[in-house]
Curated annotation (Swiss-Prot):
SUPFAM superfamilies: Ribosomal protein S18. GO terms for cellular component: cytosolic small ribosomal subunit. Part of the 30S ribosomal subunit. Forms a tight heterodimer with protein bS6. GO terms for biological process: translation. PANTHER family: 30S RIBOSOMAL PROTEIN S18, SMALL RIBOSOMAL SUBUNIT PROTEIN BS18M. This is Small ribosomal subunit protein bS18. It comes from Sulfurimonas denitrificans (strain ATCC 33889 / DSM 1251) (Thiomicrospira denitrificans (strain ATCC 33889 / DSM 1251)).
């Protein structure tokens, strides 16, 4: 049986900063939780706690509905710095 991959323990940066509310219009803060294809990154990679991961998912979904962040990017249009044009 294959062994499970071990990940380094990460700590929630939102808990350390004592964040209680996140705004969907703050696209710059969302970039740490999105991949280069604008997918929501999992908790094991970002180190977020469950509470903040759920909050981030809700905020990203609201930003997508408001057309501030694209839903997905096709393979041909992936860019190396996806948030350069969102500033």
């Amino acid at each position: 049986m294959a062994e499970r991959r071990k990940y380094k323990k990460r700590y929630c940066k939102y808990c350390e900063a004592k964040v209680d509310f996140m705004d969907y219009k703050d696209v710059g803060a969302l970039r740490f939780s999105l991949s280069e294809r604008y997918k929501i990154m999992p908790r094991r990679l970002t180190g977020n706690c469950k509470r903040h991961q759920d909050m981030i998912a809700t905020v990203i979904k609201r930003a997508r509905a408001a057309a501030l962040v694209p839903y997905t990017v096709t393979r041909n249009t992936v860019v190396t710095a996806p948030f350069e044009n969102l500033r």
